[in-house]
Amino acid sequence: MTTVRTRFAPSPTGYLHIGGVRTALFCYLFAKKNCGQFILRIDDTDQQRNVEEALAPILDGLRWLGIQWDEGPLVGGPYTPYYQSQRLEKYQAAVDRLIAEGNAYYDYALPEELQAERDAALQAKTTFVYSRRFMATTEQERAQFEAQGRKAVVRLKMPRTGKLVIDDLIRGEVTFDWAMEQDHVIQRADGSCLYHLANVVDDYEFGITHVIRAEEHLSNTPRQIFIAHSLGYELPRYAHLPFVAEPQNKTKLSKRKLDKYLKNRDFAKLVEHGKRIADRVGLQTEADGFNPVIVDFYRQVGYLPEAIDNYIALLGWALDDKAEYFMKDDLIELFTLDRVNKAPASFDPAKLFAFQEKHMLQLPLENKYSRVLRYLLAANLVASDGVASTVFTDLPDEMPINIMLSMPGCPELSPGQVRTTIEKLIVAAGDRIKVSGDILDFADFFASDTDFPIDEKVWDKRIVQDANAAALLKELQERFAAIPEDKFTAAETEALLHAFMEEKELKPAQIIHALRVVTTGKGVGLGMFEALEILGRARTLKRFETALAKIA
């Protein structure tokens, strides 16, 4: 039985698009489902690009998502090299064979001559079919054209009659009319080969059994099949995926239409949420990569790769009408091409965010801890001698959990106390931490207890305008001071406050809001008693002192 081999063949564009990820993921899942191999090949026939620099975000993005290739850049394999720019001799050999066997020809037509033929066909309301007037099939004909200063491209000599029928694994039977095909260029005048030839040669030489790709390549299939047949290659099976569409639209999703997408409320919320996090860790939000159409956006903000995989898998594929939440192993076990829809799937920012929330809630505390550290370090809320750089992009997505930390705002805390503070904060925050970067919403817990930020409007309302606030807080401070450090828990402080309110005949609103602003500087936030436990007895009392001094 032939081993299933799929491939993802991106051009080094400098970014990894959501649509590209969906193609790569489906190729990966299909290969793994069938105990096969997933190959990464780089289609770098465009000589104008800096391949190494432009390729890095693509490789990093795939690895972050866990879409690991079995062969390709960085890992090698039996068919190396995996860059088209390093396989030019193979393409030239294919061109020479196509010409020698009459399936391709040298063409010396000038651009204006081709345009004149197109214009004539348009005027006659007929399909443009190149006349082949400038085709050279002998050395003598080539010499005559070249004596006129013309340079040749190489074109396929496509059939002009009959039909081609392919059995697409997603779309079923698709029929093409050969008369509608052009004599496509496969080699430029400078000798460089075009994508269509290189793809066919590489797919054959790499033993690709299934070409799973975007539907925009469906129209390329006839010329590629013609090349393969002409070279005596066995054809792979084809599966053309529907494109990923814009939010609430059926137009193809594009990274260049960010301004348009920002008019969509959910898309705008996704971007604004990301910007709040990015600004705190020094990321450039105007950069090309900071765009929800690009995968790196989610990595920078702190989404989980498994959540992105889960959501993207459902852009065009579904197991049934009910099941939605899958881990990667589940997807590998369940994925089949016959469940891929033919219609475009619209990118839904709200649904993606919901998947992230679900996966984040299920993440164990230890994993959350390792992920939020990157943001705390980059925002200088914690520090560590074991970290060479706190520049966000220099830090790994998951930090070692045994790293020794200090808190610049509270240098008296031991590394163990800093870790406990962070872990208690994560637990208390619960579903408020929707992405790892959301830990920065709780920066007040890392601030100095003698100089923490206070919302002045809340302070004025709850402290200045309440004549009884100062006296009540002073007495409450004394009650809290009587609790031993190891007993200073949410349950203990809550019991104390309820007893205090009963004794003073207070309603909760008469003290709880003042207590919150005195200890956290905010009018809203985590559960009051969970917040006190996170701060601990010593820090809580220091904050009381700071607040009472401010009142005085």
Label each region the model flagged.
Residues M1-Q123, S192, S219-Y233, A307:
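N-terminal Rossmann-like or analogous alpha/beta NTP/dinucleotide-binding catalytic cores
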Residues P81-S85, R188, F206-H217, A245-E306, ...:
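Conserved phosphate-binding loops in nucleotide/dinucleotide-binding enzymes
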Residues R97, Y105-Y106, L110-N264, I294, ...:
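Active-site cores that bind ATP or allylic diphosphates and position pyrophosphate for catalysis
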Residues F488-I551:
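Charged substrate- and nucleic-acid-binding regions of tRNA-handling and nucleotidyl-transfer enzymes
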Residues P242-P247, Y325-T336:
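A glycine-rich phosphate-binding loop feature that marks nucleotide/adenosyl-phosphate handling sites
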Residues L365-K504:
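Small-residue-rich helix-loop
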Residues G36-F38, D202-G207, K255, T285-P292, ...:
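Short acidic (Asp/Glu) and glycine-rich catalytic loops that position anionic groups and cofactors
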Residues C27, I58, L98, G102, ...:
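Residue-level signal for inorganic ion chemistry
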